[in-house]
Structures are given as structure tokens and as C-alpha cells.
A protein has these predicted regions:
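Flexible internal linker/loop segments at domain or repeat junctions
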Residues: 103-109, 113
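Extended hydrophobic/aromatic segments used for targeting, binding, or gating
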Residues: 145-159
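Gram-positive cell-envelope targeting signals
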Residues: 232-236
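Core helices of alpha-solenoid repeat scaffolds
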Residues: 6-7, 48-52, 98, 102, ...
Length: 236
């Protein structure tokens, strides 16, 4: 028994369309099939192109994405960029959409280096932006506010020294499980970026493959490995 999460959950989705719950579904479906480059057979109900197109069609005027309505949200924008990142150099429509999304995130960075969702600056929005920039081969520590505080500085704002966890909002007193989980994988994404790797690349060859970094339209390559360092040019 059991179900194949890639076949039954994505390209031959048994529970309606992959985006049944909204754009979140399409984003994570695309991330899932790309973790190991899973092939989608001819005749499948849904293709990679279907997932990409759904994400592109749901970008809002401000350049970001949202779970509902027409006001862009940093969390969903970050996730959408993460899903589209592998297609940036080969698809002009994807490139244009991602560039707009990155601009939206950059413009939303506060003086402290964090981002907000629903009017509240918080850990999770900041974490998703970090993962998005890392996925694009852009050093999150180089993405700064006008005052010079980086996204990594913004994330550190939510660290709870008394518990080792992360707060949802800086005014909270108790660490939050969701905030801590997202902060930890944002830190992992940053570490992978430093090694020339990608958070969502689960291929067996990921540690030895050549990594292509996409930074504001420029393409850089570096031998990826445990000790590899990746330096992205100016404009990243």
C-alpha cells in the first residue's frame, strides 16, 4: 500500500489539482518534484510547466505573491522565488517575475534587516527571504536595509538566548516552534549557499555537481563541495 507523494501528490494528484489549497500547493509541488529531478511522464495530469505557469499567473501587481487577495506577502513571495529559481536562466517570463519578486523583498526590508507579513515584522518572513536569496545565488548577508543591516542581522533579532529557539515577533517572550524551524532551515540555506550548494537539491550527486549561481541576471559557476566557497559579483 501507501502512496507515491510525487505521483499521487503532484503530477497525477489524487486530491484535486496540485493548487487546490492555493498557490502554496503549486509552489511546494514544484519544489518537491525538483528536489531530485523527478521525471514527469508524458500523459501525466500536470506538468512542471503547469506548475510554473500557475505561479506566474498569480503574481500580483506589486511584484510579489500572496496566499489570497492582491496584497503581496513576503513569506509567499520568498517561497515562490525558491520554487522558480531553477528556471531563472532558461525562461524569460520566469526571470522577469523573479526579478520583480526580489525587488519586492528588497524594498520590504526594515532598518533592522527583517521583513513583515500582515503588518507585523517577524522571524518567518525574514527566514523565507533568506532562503529565496540563497536559492538565487545571492548572499543573504549582502542584502541590506538602507541602514546597512542585513537579512541575517534581521533573523538574529528573533533569537531567544534563554532557550536557543526563535521568537515569532521580537516582542514575544516565548520561543515559537514554527519560527524556530524556519529560522533553522534559513540558516541551513545560508550555509549551503556558502558551500555552493542548494537547500532543496536532494540529488545523490549534489555534493560534487557544479553549481550555477544566478545573481541579478549574471551566471557564475563554482566547484561545489564541502569546503567550496562561492563569491558572487557586484550587483548581487
Amino acid at each position: 500500500g501507501g502512496q507515491n507523494l510525487i505521483e499521487d501528490g503532484v503530477y497525477n494528484c489524487l486530491a484535486g489539482e496540485p493548487w487546490e489549497q492555493g498557490i502554496n500547493g503549486a509552489i511546494w509541488a514544484l519544489l518537491s518534484v525538483d528536489t531530485k529531478g523527478y521525471p514527469i511522464p508524458e500523459g501525466a495530469k500536470y506538468s512542471r510547466e503547469d506548475l510554473i505557469q500557475y505561479i506566474l499567473e498569480n503574481q500580483v501587481k506589486s511584484g510579489g505573491w500572496t496566499l489570497s487577495g492582491n496584497i503581496a506577502d513576503a513569506d509567499i513571495t520568498g517561497m515562490a522565488i525558491q520554487a522558480l529559481a531553477p528556471y531563472y536562466t532558461g525562461d524569460e517570463a520566469v526571470k522577469a517575475a523573479v526579478d520583480q519578486g526580489l525587488t519586492f523583498l528588497r524594498n520590504g526590508i526594515s532598518a533592522d534587516g527583517d521583513l513583515e507579513s500582515g503588518g507585523d515584522y517577524n522571524c518567518e518572513s525574514t527566514a523565507q527571504a533568506i532562503v529565496a536569496f540563497a536559492a538565487m545565488g545571492i548572499d543573504p548577508s549582502s542584502v541590506t536595509s538602507s541602514g546597512g543591516r542585513s537579512l541575517m542581522d534581521g533573523l538574529a533579532k528573533y533569537y531567544n538566548t534563554s532557550t536557543g529557539g526563535f521568537l515569532h515577533k521580537s516582542t514575544n517572550r516565548t520561543s515559537n516552534a514554527l519560527a524556530t524551524g524556519q529560522a533553522m532551515y534559513a540558516i541551513a540555506a545560508y550555509r549551503y549557499y556558502q558551500q555552493g550548494l542548494s537547500l532543496y537539491d536532494f540529488r545523490d550527486t549534489a555534493n560534487t555537481a557544479q553549481y550555477v549561481a544566478r545573481a541579478d541576471g549574471a551566471v557564475y559557476t563554482a566547484a561545489a563541495g564541502a569546503d567550496a566557497a562561492l563569491f558572487v559579483g557586484e550587483g548581487a
